[in-house]
Structures are given as structure tokens and as C-alpha cells.
From Swiss-Prot:
GO cellular component: cell surface; cytoplasm; extracellular space; galectin complex; plasma membrane
Positions where N6-succinyllysine occurs in the chain: 108
Protein name as it appears in the record: Galectin-1
Cleavable signal peptide: none
Residue positions where N6-acetyllysine is found in the record: 13, 19, 29, 108, 128
N-acetylalanine modified-residue sites: 2
List of residues binding a beta-D-galactoside: 45-49, 53, 62, 69-72
Residues modified to Phosphoserine: 30
Domain Galectin: 4-135
InterPro entries to which the protein is assigned, alphabetical: ConA-like_dom_sf, Galectin-like, Galectin_CRD
Keyword Acetylation: yes
Keywords: Acetylation, Apoptosis, Cytoplasm, Extracellular matrix, Lectin, Phosphoprotein, Secreted
Described function: Lectin that binds beta-galactoside and a wide array of complex carbohydrates. Plays a role in regulating apoptosis, cell proliferation and cell differentiation. Inhibits CD45 protein phosphatase activity and therefore the dephosphorylation of Lyn kinase. Strong inducer of T-cell apoptosis. Plays a negative role in Th17 cell differentiation via activation of the receptor CD69.
């Protein structure tokens, strides 16, 4: 998958928040935020799907360990609207990543790779990043 934005050397530590704000395309089908060590080692593949890959209004999360995908986890909370500005906040610790959605709903995804720092972020799909912040 070609990536719209790739950032490295982030050095995001446990407890710190990565906020990503951007604009969803009016005809959005899906978008992806990948976080981890590099493109083959992802502690989080965050993939909201409006209508893609057989899913509708579902968030699909996964991990990738040395190039091998893990088991998908689906979240039915879906506060995203095509054509709108949206923001996601992601924090992590040794056990889990916590994803805070635009409507305030939070859910957890296991830190399967036991990452102690997130150094890589990639974004792709029907989402134009406007701002990335660390808190």
C-alpha cells in the first residue's frame, strides 16, 4: 500500500498522546493510520471503513509482527462522517493502546508487540492530515 504520509523517529513514549486531525473526503471509503517501529512491525493498524473490504461503518484494527498480520479486531462505534474534519487520539502502555474517537468513545487494542516506543506513523486513504500533535 502506498502511503500518503510517513513519519519516523517519533519516539512516542508510554502515556503520551498522539493526536491526528484531518479532513475526510466527501466520498470516503476508508482510511488507515499505522503506528509502530516500521512498516513491517505495527503495534496498531487503525482502519475505519465506511464501505470497503466487505465492511461498512466499522473500525478494523490489527497488528503486524515482522511482516505477518495478526488477528483483526472490529469496533462498531463509528463516529466518522465523510466530508468532515475529524480527530483521533492514541495513547499506549505496555499492555494496550487506547484509541479515543471524535465523539469521546474510547476502546483498547492490545499492545501485541510489547512496544516501548512508537517511532513510525503512516497514513493513507481518504483522509488528508491537517495536524499531528504530541501531548
Amino acid at each position: 500500500m502506498a502511503c500518503g504520509l510517513v513519519a519516523s523517529n517519533l519516539n512516542l513514549k508510554p502515556g503520551e498522546c498522539l493526536k491526528v486531525r484531518g479532513e475526510l473526503a466527501p466520498d470516503a471509503k476508508s482510511f488507515v493510520l499505522n503506528l509502530g517501529k516500521d512498516s513491517n512491525n505495527l503495534c496498531l493498524h487503525f482502519n475505519p471503513r465506511f464501505n470497503a473490504h466487505g465492511d461498512a461503518n466499522t473500525i478494523v484494527c490489527n497488528s503486524k509482527d515482522d511482516g505477518t498480520w495478526g488477528t483483526e479486531q472490529r469496533e462498531t462505534a463509528f463516529p466518522f462522517q465523510p466530508g468532515s474534519i475529524t480527530e483521533v487520539c492514541i495513547t499506549f502502555d505496555q499492555a494496550d493502546l487506547t484509541i479515543k474517537l471524535p465523539d469521546g468513545h474510547e476502546f483498547k487494542f492490545p499492545n501485541r508487540l510489547n512496544m516501548e516506543a512508537i517511532n513510525y506513523m503512516a497514513a493513507d486513504g481518504d483522509f488528508k492530515i491537517k495536524c499531528v500533535a504530541f501531548e
